[in-house]
Amino acid sequence: MLTKEKIAEILRESYPHLIAKYGVKRLGLFGSYAKGEQNEDSDVDLVAEFERPIGLRFIEFAEYIEKILGKKADILTPEGIRQITITRIAQDIEQSIIYV
């Protein structure tokens, strides 16, 4: 089973490609994997910051992340987190982010 350490390792190894192709500025892990509460059915929750908006290439980016991790990934941007209207959920996400 994937661990937060293995996810961080995979993402760090992919950083040169992610920066060059998508302009990734920073990636963070949150949710069950960040808290060590994952199970076999857990997806990987990430927050991705980009140098500039990537538009529809975000779909390609998400598919690439799922491919390298071998798991479904839910990816938010910092703006997406700010738009969460339930304050407790947004705060929980922000407090659990582990940047890689």
Language-model regions, residue ranges each:
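Short beta-strand->loop micro-motif that forms the acidic, two-metal-ion catalytic signature
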Residues: 45-48
